[in-house]
Amino acid sequence: MKRVYFIGIGGIGMSAIARYFHAKGFNVCGYDLTPSPITDQLIKEGIEVHFSDDLNMIPKAFFSPTDSLIVYTPAVPADHSELTYFRSNGYRVVKRAEVLGEITLMERALCVAGTHGKTTTSTLLAHLLKQSHVDCNAFLGGISNNYQSNLLLSDKSDLVVVEADEFDRSFHHLKPFMAIITSADPDHMDIYGTAENYRDSFEHFTSLIQSGGALVLKYGAPVNPRLGSDVSLFTYSSDDQQADYFASDIMIRDGRLFFTWHYPGGQLEGVELGVPVRINVENAVAAMAIAHLNGVTVEELRSGIASFKGSHRRFEKVLDTERVVLIDDYAHHPVELDAAIHSVREIYSGKHIMGIFQPHLYSRTADFYQDFARSLSMLDEVVLLDIYPARELPLPGVTSRLILDLIENPNKTLVSKNDLLDYLHGNEIPDVVLILGAGDIDRLVIPVKQYLQTLC
């Protein structure tokens, strides 16, 4: 195999694998639906990307079934003409998760799964290992602010940190040496159908942990592990002392966050979290546990936690001035919205907070619109955008207005994505603006930031 072609190369997981093959010397190119900051960066790195579902756009060298591997994301529709062509003409066509499983099979994979928190936890775990004497490789589900990439490579470590995605049961292709499960709140009901099926998928994932490995499971998570007899089980919590790993003495002071980390046989006091948000304490406890189990010393943990800068779009402070603060967050599930909004309320107590939310998927909106409305009602002002459909076709009667009508706050409105800047221009800007969503709302972050800067 000499060449790898990606259908959906702009996805966060796909782009990491594309970068991996490019770094290993393969000829790499791909298709995506629209340009994005990720595709812009891939092009800068020398990877050819086009944005039309058109076989004529693919370099001729890739039309060789014996030399070319075709990788696609499940988000691509089944009738995509490029995908259909390759499937019909003898090419090896595989999902992203299958390739990731093969890449990690010969290494010791540290896999982070969960409905929420897996990107921050895996990125933090990778940083703890990377800045220690242990080192690691990593395929991340977000862009690390420490390394400005979603791919980390090492020439000395056989550890690989992997964000284990439950969508389409993708994480069943992995063979973890150790794993973290951060949560198992039902999601992707269009795939799983029931909450029981969703949780069963996580339980099957635990059965894949290799002999001699370990599972670090959030204390109280609704998952019954199916572990081999020689796989260790540990629990963790942000504050419950019944867990094997937990935090205590959590203190936020002058914009800084400190806590004590407890582990079997000891504790580490005065740990400072580089991203001082309370929701990250729990993620830190889990990441520190796996890092410690793999040889990172407690003092290396202390320095690594303090130097962690977070991930793009994970409670990322984009603008911080005396006039206004802009925070960008990937939250797209009600539990994630709750966490983000509670964190903003805690950090900016007494401030007027506006949330701009773009619902993600018609199916998720239909499942959770009441919960979304309940979460958003905690804000002082709510701006709703239209639903981002991603891979889905519209569902009858499912629009953002379902959420809007149930928000218990008169300061609410529904605007189109294209009209958002005009809306902001015409209204009083509050103390804090919180951008929320997993769709293409990220493309509005810079324009919103630029406008807010004119007010300072």
Swiss-Prot record:
PANTHER family: UDP-N-ACETYLMURAMATE--L-ALANINE LIGASE, UDP-N-ACETYLMURAMATE--L-ALANINE LIGASE-RELATED. This is UDP-N-acetylmuramate--L-alanine ligase. Its main location: cytoplasm. The lineage of its organism: Bacteria, Pseudomonadati, Bacteroidota, Bacteroidia, Bacteroidales. The keyword Secreted does not apply. Belongs to the MurCDEF family. Keywords: ATP-binding, Cell cycle, Cell division, Cell shape, Cell wall biogenesis/degradation, Cytoplasm, Ligase, Nucleotide-binding, Peptidoglycan synthesis. It comes from the Bacteria. Its EC number is 6.3.2.8. ATP binds at G114, T115, H116, G117, K118, T119, T120. It is an enzyme of class 6 (ligase). Pathway: Cell wall biogenesis; peptidoglycan biosynthesis. GO terms for biological process: cell division; cell wall organization; peptidoglycan biosynthetic process; regulation of cell shape. It is found in: Cytoplasm. HAMAP family: MurC. GO terms for molecular function: ATP binding; UDP-N-acetylmuramate-L-alanine ligase activity. Gene3D superfamilies: Mur ligase, C-terminal domain, Mur-like, catalytic domain, NAD(P)-binding Rossmann-like Domain. Transmembrane segments: none annotated. The keyword Lyase does not apply. It catalyses: UDP-N-acetyl-alpha-D-muramate + L-alanine + ATP = UDP-N-acetyl-alpha-D-muramoyl-L-alanine + ADP + phosphate + H(+). One of its GO terms (cellular component) is cytoplasm. It comes from Porphyromonas gingivalis (strain ATCC BAA-308 / W83). Cell wall formation.
